[in-house]
Regions:
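Divalent metal-coordination and catalytic microenvironments
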Residues: 36, 51, 61, 71, ...
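Conserved beta-strand hairpin/beta-sheet module of binuclear metal-dependent hydrolase folds
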Residues: 26-78, 171-194
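Short, flexible loop segments at the rims of nucleotide/cofactor-binding pockets, characterized by
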Residues: 36-39, 63, 88-91, 207-212
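C-terminal regulatory/interaction regions
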Residues: 3, 9-13, 259-286
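Structural recognition of the beta-strand scaffold that forms the well-ordered cores
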Residues: 39, 50, 58-60, 86-90, ...
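Active-site HxH/HxHxD metal-binding segment of metal-dependent hydrolases
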Residues: 66-67, 76-149, 256-258, 263-268
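Metallo-beta-lactamase
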Residues: 8-20, 25-27, 32-35, 64-66, 116-248, 252-255, ...
Length: 286
């Protein structure tokens, strides 16, 4: 059996988030990852997904203030108009995912969606830059409801609260159909898989308790069993995307890999278990 090309790898020591004044050294080309989905983020750290609904555009996350010009450039490059962004869906409140919101809303007047849990954290950070994480000002207009999908054009997006990396991380599931082939693909974007804040000594950083770590493990293992055709990670390293881009950047079928979602989530669950060996005996002597 050939080696799996998509797998979790640790973040690079220096990526765009640590070098926001050096975009040329940390750029990633625009690529298509679903029939009507592209990563327009333009840098080697946080993904920004553009969904063409046929009735306007949806963005999942916005990246950094310093890279938002690449998002706008890539949207134009695809032949779309940034003014047609209707909804901005935020996986969580951390600055590397939300700091482009204000600029994009200024252009488009789009709705801004976030979980209620992370809006509370957003307000705490916006007042004091708590814990050293800068969050640029923006206004949330809508809150996710896991019982009510977000519908626009061809897309019906299911949301699921998946706390851990932040209290209000939200995961997205949606189907995307290729009209030329008739094939429909189930796609997923996890809301946040960084696990440093789930260490016993770091939980307070995100105002969380030990239960957050154990819920993260349970959620990852449960969601890993959901069939997903195309895994769209929120950071490129979570599926080693930037080292595995296709020669044809328009060939989204390159990313069809039914193992990628499952393996990524199991990897993160097992990593968190190691922080809590007294709870997970299989790691007691590791």
């Amino acid at each position: 059996m050939s080696e799996k090309k998509f797998r979790y790898v640790n973040p690079k020591p220096v990526r765009f988030g640590q070098a926001t004044d050096r975009i040329s050294q940390h750029s990633v080309p625009l690529y298509r990852c679903g029939p009507h989905v592209w990563n327009v983020g333009g840098q080697d750290d946080v993904c920004v997904y553009l969904l063409d609904t046929g009735e306007g555009l949806i963005l999942i996350d916005t990246g950094y203030t310093e890279s938002v010009f690449m998002v706008v450039h890539n949207i134009w490059k695809l032949g779309f108009n940034p003014e047609d962004i209707k909804k901005i869906l935020l996986t969580h409140y951390h600055g590397d995912h939300v700091n482009g919101v204000a600029s994009l809303v200024h252009i488009s007047h789009a709705e801004v969606w976030l979980s209620r849990e992370d809006e509370r954290m957003h307000q705490l950070y916006s007042r004091a830059d708590r814990h050293g994480m800068h969050t640029a000002p923006y206004t949330v207009t809508n809150f996710f409801d896991d019982n009510t999908p977000i519908v626009l054009g061809r897309f019906t997006i299911e949301t699921k609260l998946t706390p851990g990396h932040a209290p209000g991380c939200t995961t997205f599931f949606f189907d995307d159909t290729d009209e030329e082939t008739g094939k429909t693909y189930t796609c997923a974007v996890h809301g946040g898989l960084g696990i440093a804040y789930l260490r016993p000594d770091m939980l307070a950083n995100q105002d969380q308790t030990e239960e957050a770590a154990h819920r993260f493990v349970r959620d990852c293992l449960e969601l890993a069993e959901r069939p997903v055709d195309i895994n769209m990670p929120s950071h490129l390293n979570q599926a080693d995307i930037d080292n595995n881009l296709p020669v044809d950047l328009n060939d989204y079928t390159w990313f069809v890999a039914d193992y990628s979602w499952h393996d990524m989530l199991v990897n993160r669950a097992e990593a968190v278990k190691k922080f809590w060996p007294e709870v997970y005996p299989e790691y007691k002597n590791n």
